[in-house]
Structure formats: structure tokens, C-alpha cells
């Protein structure tokens, strides 16, 4: 099943809450998720594969167009689609546009609603949002309010999702929480650290690639992790470096402990920033970066 919705409606935070650990990065900026992330929820009565998709939006770049194509392809493969609406924002044209796209691509797929971020509003506001989402989806539709931050209604949401999914074989061992490879997860952790505190268009211009992971020849038990951050203009590189390299060092300081935990090893993080001019609109560079 997958979560769909406008950018920044809490899809990635909810994915992490259901899985029980962090597999999807989160940021205050919209359009943070750039590829479908599969989280695996293990229950006594079910194994649920939750797909966190990039937010469907009206694209401004070739990257945006390709992300939308990926999202729509994901819809077509799902057994259940859940549209996410924040409790603190009114349903608007963007939500209706997404719902129309979902129904065009996957007209026969069951659809449910999830009201996210209920910890931010009053009970009365949640009740009003419940009525509004029922009106949007249909009075017989399942709609569940939930807070990924506090965990309120988490188990109820999983119960409803389980009831709506068809029976099928178990796909993953009990110790698997995602099918993302290690390099992808490392790149995402570095990108999350790089996005922290950025404003305007710069977050959309940041891409990350893991160059290599090799044993440190001088430090047994330590891995050298070589990572490249790409931006589109020299001025953006200057911003990421920060005054006297402070922002750059902050990225390393924030990402390294999480990479150590992921690899279960001490890590030397070698980070470089390179300019890849207008990569978001360059088909060749997009292909190179996995888009």
C-alpha cells in the first residue's frame, strides 16, 4: 500500500512511525522524498509493505516530471492507496488534483484517507477534517486520524490498513524494515543533514551520491565512506560550506553518527561538494544520479 498526498503532508514521518524506525528522511521543506521508499511493518497477523512516495505536484523541472511519472507508476501497482491530509490545513485544489490523478491511474484500487498531524490541532478541528475528508472520498470510505509524532491512533490505523489489504504471501524476513540498499540510505542521511536550515530553492538543487565505501587501511574496524553532494551553481556550494566551513562541518557532524549506526561500524565520512550545472533539467545528469 502507499501514501499519497501533497508535499509535506507527513508521509515520511508516518512511514517511519509505522515501521518503528527511521527509513525515510524528513525535512521542513516540501518535496524531500525523491524515490519510493518501501517500509516493512511486521505484525502477528500481517506483513504490510508501506510505500512512501514523492509528493505529487505540478512540476517545474525535468526532475519533477520524472518524479511524477514514478509516483503514478507506483499507484498502479498498489493493493491500497491512502491519501494523506494534514489536520492543520484545509482541503484544497491541490488535494482534489491528486485525488483525480489517483483515480485516473488506479481506478479500481481501494482508497482510504489519513488525517495526519492531529497533535497540532484540537479535537474539534480533527472532527471537522474527518467530515471534510469523508465528503471528498465518499461517505463509506475509511478515514483514520493519526499522529506520527505521539503515536496516537497508530495501532488503529494499522488495523484498518490490514483489514483493507488482500491476503497474500510473506515477502520479507522478520528482520527487514526496508528494501533500500545501503548506499541509498547513506546518501539520504547526508541529504537530510544538508537540507537542515536551507531555504528557498536551494534544497531542490541538492543531490547526493555515495562514491565508495572501503575499509580504512590505518584504522582497523573503521570504514571510509566517500560521499559527493551536488549543487547546481557555485553560489549554492558557498552556502552549503558556510562561514569558515561551519555548515559543511555541521553536515558531517549530523550525518556521521547515523551512518555509523546503519553500518554498525566506526566511520570516517569524507564529504565533497561539487557543482553539476542545472542537473535537475539535464537528462544525462538525471540518469547518472538515478532519476
Predicted regions and their residues:
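P-loop NTP-binding site
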Residues: 182-291
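Conserved G1/Walker A P-loop phosphate-binding module
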Residues: 1-80, 85
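Conserved glycine(s) of the Walker
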Residues: 10, 153, 247
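Catalytic P-loop NTPase motifs of RecA-like helicase/translocase cores
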Residues: 33, 57-58, 90-91, 121-122, ...
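Conserved, well-folded catalytic cores of nucleic-acid-processing
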Residues: 21, 40-44, 74-81, 105, ...
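Canonical P-loop GTPase G-domain recognition
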Residues: 109-112, 119-182
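Conserved C-terminal guanine-recognition region of P-loop GTPase G domains, centered on the G4
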Residues: 41-47, 66-143, 214-222
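PAPS/PAP-binding and catalytic site of the sulfotransferase fold
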Residues: 14, 18, 155-164, 227-231
Amino acid at each position: 500500500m502507499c501514501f499519497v498526498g501533497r508535499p509535506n503532508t507527513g508521509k515520511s514521518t508516518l512511514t517511519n512511525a509505522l515501521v518503528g524506525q527511521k527509513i525515510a528522511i524528513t525535512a521542513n521543506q516540501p518535496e524531500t522524498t525523491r524515490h519510493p521508499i518501501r517500509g516493512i511493518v511486521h505484525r502477528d497477523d500481517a506483513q504490510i509493505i508501506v510505500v512512501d512516495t514523492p509528493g505529487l505536484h505540478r512540476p517545474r523541472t525535468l526532475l519533477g516530471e520524472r518524479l511524477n511519472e514514478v509516483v503514478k507508476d507506483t499507484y498502479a501497482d498498489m493493493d491500497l492507496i491512502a491519501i494523506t491530509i494534514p489536520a492543520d490545513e484545509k482541503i484544497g485544489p491541490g488535494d482534489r488534483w491528486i485525488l483525480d490523478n489517483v483515480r485516473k491511474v488506479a481506478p479500481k484500487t481501494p482508497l482510504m484517507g489519513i488525517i495526519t498531524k492531529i497533535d497540532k490541532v484540537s479535537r474539534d478541528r480533527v472532527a471537522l477534517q474527518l467530515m471534510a475528508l469523508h465528503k471528498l472520498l465518499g461517505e463509506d470510505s475509511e478515514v483514520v486520524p493519526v499522529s506520527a509524532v505521539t503515536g496516537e491512533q497508530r495501532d488503529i490505523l494499522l488495523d484498518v490498513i490490514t483489514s483493507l489489504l488482500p491476503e497474500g504471501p510473506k515477502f520479507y524476513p522478520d528482520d527487514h524494515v526496508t528494501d533500500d540498499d545501503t548506499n541509498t540510505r547513506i546518501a539520504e542521511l547526508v541529504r537530510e543533514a544538508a537540507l537542515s536550515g536551507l531555504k528557498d530553492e536551494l534544497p531542490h538543487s541538492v543531490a547526493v551520491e555515495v562514491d565508495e565505501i572501503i575499509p580504512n587501511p590505518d584504522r582497523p574496524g573503521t570504514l571510509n565512506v566517500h560521499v559527493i553532494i551536488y549543487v547546481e551553481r557555485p553560489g549554492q556550494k558557498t552556502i552549503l560550506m558556510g562561514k569558515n566551513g561551519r555548515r559543511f562541518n555541521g553536515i558531517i557532524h549530523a550525518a556521521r553518527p547515523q551512518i555509523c549506526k546503519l553500518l554498525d561500524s566506526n566511520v570516517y565520512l569524507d564529504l565533497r561538494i561539487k557543482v553539476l550545472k542545472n542537473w535537475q533539467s539535464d537528462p544525462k545528469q538525471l540518469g547518472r544520479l538515478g532519476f
